[in-house]
């Protein structure tokens, strides 16, 4: 898969707390990564552990705001098609760097279609440079991240280069986020400070259906899809495929339709936390009286009222129309533990408009 397409939001506080989970955790004084759960469901499940993280800093870059944070090195899984592959922690890995991007004007988490790269420098010399993976994790949601090897303790500069958004931008975002941008954040790395981050395990819940709560966010938006009754338009259906929850609406708002037709908006999200699922390929059909009214791809899109979603402009939609949404490619986004077995094998969604 390509290391590109979506960024999440995060807190701008110094140390990031996990909300609502303390009673479920046992804090370890010494970090020891547990083995992966053997009998994992093909669904979202409680991971073996969760790790704290700390905000390094933030910077403005063109129309974007970037937040950078770090944690312990993580194991994670990449996805290519319907195949997942575990990425283990290397002995030389020192930290897991994570980047988040959002729009300050609307508080909307933004996809960056042409990718993101990170360059880590010390005293003007490049230590490492690579494009981080687009990821989802239960406590953070969407972010770009990867494990990095540093050159000992000290001061580092992390430069983030952001590409333009190559997704559909109906409404207020039309014409914005067209240019590439860059921002640099200074980072003081200390082993003691890293090792002082929280590291908490699930002793009894690991492997069970459920999810860790998203982090508390103070100064930054949260990458959460809206509740069904908060989505614009007429709600058509809620359905589940591959453990993802799909909310589908028909929107006639001119900011979506340019004044004509009906916009079919499809919002896939994780169960429990409603984290939007990016980097999918969806297509759909609409039939009326057995005759095709639409047959085509749904475009990746972002709008302040829905966030990241998939949509298509129709000439209209009526009661008794038969709608099918097909997942041509599941989310090609890397996953932290607890998400790697879900959202892989995904059946079509079929419903009749009531």
Set out the residue ranges of the language-model regions:
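Intrinsically disordered, low-complexity boundary segments flanking structured domains
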Residues: 51-57, 173-175, 231-238
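Short beta-strand elements
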Residues: 172-205, 339-354
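Alpha-helical, hydrophobic structural elements that either
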Residues: 212-247, 269
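Flexible internal linker/loop segments at domain or repeat junctions
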Residues: 237, 247-259
């Amino acid at each position: 898969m390509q290391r590109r397409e979506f960024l999440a939001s995060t807190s701008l506080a110094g140390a990031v707390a996990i909300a609502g989970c303390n009673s479920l955790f046992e804090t370890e004084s010494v970090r020891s990564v547990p083995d992966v759960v053997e009998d994992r469901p093909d669904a979202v499940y409680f991971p073996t552990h969760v790790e704290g993280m700390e905000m390094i800093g933030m910077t403005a870059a063109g129309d974007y705001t970037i937040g950078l944070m770090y944690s312990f090195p993580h194991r994670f899984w990449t996805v290519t098609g319907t195949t997942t592959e575990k990425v283990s922690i290397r002995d030389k890995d020192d930290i897991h760097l994570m980047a988040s991007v959002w729009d300050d004007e609307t508080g909307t988490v933004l996809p960056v279609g042409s990718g993101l790269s990170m360059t880590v420098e010390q005293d003007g010399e490049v230590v490492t440079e690579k494009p981080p993976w687009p990821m989802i994790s239960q406590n953070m949601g969407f972010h770009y991240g990867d494990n990095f090897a540093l050159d000992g303790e000290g001061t580092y500069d992390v430069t983030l280069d952001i590409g333009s958004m190559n997704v559909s931008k109906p409404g207020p975002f039309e014409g914005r986020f067209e240019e590439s941008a860059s921002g640099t954040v200074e980072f003081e790395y200390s082993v003691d400070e890293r090792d002082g981050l929280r590291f908490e395990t699930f002793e009894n819940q690991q492997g069970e259906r459920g999810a860790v709560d998203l982090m508390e966010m103070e100064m930054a938006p949260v990458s959460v899809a809206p509740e069904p009754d908060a989505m614009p338009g007429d709600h058509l259906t809620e359905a589940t495929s591959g453990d993802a929850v799909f909310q589908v609406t028909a929107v006639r708002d001119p900011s979506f339709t340019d004044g004509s037709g009906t916009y079919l908006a499809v919002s896939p999200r994780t169960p429990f936390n409603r984290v939007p699922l990016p980097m999918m390929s969806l297509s759909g059909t609409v039939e009326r009286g057995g005759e095709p009214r639409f047959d085509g791809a749904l475009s990746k899109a972002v709008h302040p009222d829905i966030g990241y979603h998939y949509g298509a402009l129709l000439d209209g939609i009526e009661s008794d129309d038969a709608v099918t949404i097909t997942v041509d490619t599941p989310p090609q986004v890397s996953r932290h533990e607890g998400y790697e077995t879900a959202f892989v094998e995904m059946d079509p969604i079929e419903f009749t408009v009531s």
